Amino acid sequence: MLFNIWFGSSLCYLFLLPFSWVYGFFSTLNRISYKYGWRKVYRFSVPIIVIGNLTIGGNGKTPMVLWLIDQLKTRGWRVGVVSRGYGGRSDKYPIIINSTSCSKKCGDEPLLIWRRTGVLVSVSPNRVKAVSALLKKQPLLDIIISDDGLQHYALFRDIEWVVVHSLRRFGNGCWLPAGPMRERITRLNTVQAIIINGLSNDIQSGAILMQLCPRSIINLVTGEIRPIQPLKDVVAIAGIGYPKQFFMTLQDYGIFPIKTIEFSDHHMYSEIMLSSLTSGNEMLLMTEKDAIKCLDFAHENWWYVHIDVNIHQEDTKKLLSKIESTIQYYKNN
């Protein structure tokens, strides 16, 4: 309902504006309280890069984190990640993810990052404590990536990237709850990189384009890998911030599901729920983020799409140059 108000043409947002003004006041107060030293900002012995959003979910932030981890690991840097762990709930934080971790406690995105990359991942609502736990476990990290957390100002950051979806952009431009904005659009003036997810003819000067590119589909039970190709008899599901993006991507690659089903972001699935969605020889196709939560009860007709990020070579050099110079600065001082 709210997403239709935020990204559609409905005037219902007008009724929510008073609440947005309250949110905006406290959001601004929170930021300036750290900016002017009224509240403590915690700095660590390694550089920290935050990859976040100005809006609520579904912008492609986590794929961007995965891309950056791969780029840095390829260059020999030791990388750690901290995350809030949305969708998870635990009695004890921070959590250092390992082979026994489950998404119900640590969240789906941190578990996905760990499984894809193998880097140390620390989860906590308090990112300062998450970083401390990470460095206690591995003091020799070269850099730490914060998956989201742009508004977590208690954590000092050396570099900030903001990911913007090319289609949804900033919706109606209003603060929560009348709109999707966590902060004003002017916040873009203070970040080191604006990453536009998807093709766009109208981008900010200096912004960098990224594209989500499906590489293969992978079976949840057997691990079999197949190339992306036109498929029939497919039921597609997505429990992410912007499910329609996943379905549109499938169509771009010749996959036209007989049925598409949207779930809320971080939705927790059950075997009974998903097994009832297909019949006969139909394939159940989902995002990798969904698959992370289904591995323990998956059926052999369940597959997920492996997606990579594609960024132009010159833009890649530009992004990594700033990061590597920051890492070297910390090592020399």
From Swiss-Prot:
InterPro entries for this protein: LpxK, P-loop_NTPase
Recorded catalytic activity of this chain's protein: a lipid A disaccharide + ATP = a lipid IVA + ADP + H(+)
Pfam families for this protein: LpxK
EC number, as in UniProt: 2.7.1.130
One Gene Ontology term of the molecular function aspect: tetraacyldisaccharide 4'-kinase activity
Gene Ontology biological process terms, A to Z: lipid A biosynthetic process; lipopolysaccharide core region biosynthetic process
Transmembrane is among the record's keywords: no
Pathway: Glycolipid biosynthesis; lipid IV(A) biosynthesis; lipid IV(A) from (3R)-3-hydroxytetradecanoyl-[acyl-carrier-protein] and UDP-N-acetyl-alpha-D-glucosamine: step 6/6
GO cellular component: plasma membrane
The protein's enzyme class: transferase
Binding sites annotated in the UniProt record for ATP: T55, I56, G57, G58, N59, G60, K61, T62
Record keywords, A-Z: ATP-binding, Kinase, Lipid A biosynthesis, Lipid biosynthesis, Lipid metabolism, Nucleotide-binding, Transferase
Family: Belongs to the LpxK family.
PANTHER family registered for this protein in UniProt: TETRAACYLDISACCHARIDE 4'-KINASE (PTHR42724), TETRAACYLDISACCHARIDE 4'-KINASE, MITOCHONDRIAL-RELATED (PTHR42724:SF1)
Function description: Transfers the gamma-phosphate of ATP to the 4'-position of a tetraacyldisaccharide 1-phosphate intermediate (termed DS-1-P) to form tetraacyldisaccharide 1,4'-bis-phosphate (lipid IVA).
The protein, known as: Tetraacyldisaccharide 4'-kinase
Gene: lpxK
